[in-house]
Amino acid sequence: MKRAVLPISTFSLMFLLSAATAQNSSPTGGGAQNAINGINSYPGPEFVKYEPEREALDRRIDLFLNDWQGSMPRHEHGSLVLRDILTRGDNFAPSEKGAVLHYGNFLAYGRLSPWNSTLPSRLERQQEVFYILGGQGEITAGSDTAALRKDIAVFMPANLEFVMRSTSAEPLVMYVINEPTPADFHPKTKMAVKDESAGHQRTPAGGDPYVVPGASGHWGHIVRELFSPADGLATEQSVITVTLNPLTMGEPHPHRPGQEEIWAAIDGDSLAFLGTEIRIQRPGMAYMLPPDASTIHSNINASNRPAKFLYFAKFPDGDNWRHGAPAATR
């Protein structure tokens, strides 16, 4: 059954923002200014700039948020059933819901039935990341075999034959990220397997009074690293998880053209703050912020348990975008 995407009054958001500002009344400092890859922070909330008037078509934000339950099933690698969430389209004006990707090929929800296996397959001119959401299984590529369970991530390079198997009475379910490879790209010859719980946890990039304990930036983002170009990514530049502890939120901020950043919910319900709208985001839902340098976004965890996201992104070429910082006060 397709889930309803519920608009929420901005009153609750304003309450949360006011509370966050009251609790973080430290004096403004130089702080970390690097605005890429989720490790930055504005020097202070005063640097978030809002449009002077409400965008007449701002409810178009619903085109940038999608749920796999609204998609028709298709098959990949034989018996792996995919339900698309985000697909190729336009970063700014998608022709249909979820058709927002310019660089990546797709983000889908995958399901392998109990005790089933895929056909021996090779990815041609494309690569995939499998992030396991539930079930038990194993994957074999070349001479390597790895066990699959919740929060195991697998990077499968192009041209490497592999087989995935479900080894329990529960379906093996996952997010599937698919990226293209350029013509002159030389893929890795082995798959990479990461246990998310053992991934490197980032620390703050600079002295920011607004970052909560344990987070690495954007106020409340707890980041664990999965895959980067060093692991073999061709188009995407970062695959990580981001966790928000109970009653915390990310720093509202925009993205500039060329930044394709995806947030797919893994655990917990949260609030996606997009432009001037709020939507409930549940596991199985993902969004991309329009990278127009003015529409802001944040993820808000108003619950009593952690909320975790799978994040992947392509950044503008040569990106070192910086926000201006106020002069230090004496």
Identify what each model region corresponds to.
Residues 24-103, 184-238, 320-330:
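A short, N-terminal "cap"/entry segment at the start of jelly-roll beta-barrel domains
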Residues 8-18:
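Bacterial N-terminal signal peptides
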Residues 143-158, 276-292:
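Short acidic-glycine-tyrosine-enriched beta hairpin
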Residues 125-138, 258-271, 275:
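Glycine- and acidic-residue-biased ligand/ion/polar-headgroup-sensing regions
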Residues 1-9:
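Bacterial N-terminal signal peptides that target proteins for export
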Residues 158-184, 282-285, 291-318:
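Ligand-binding loop in jelly-roll beta-barrel domains
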Residues 87-96, 108-123, 240-256:
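Conserved short histidine dyad/triad with adjacent acidic residue
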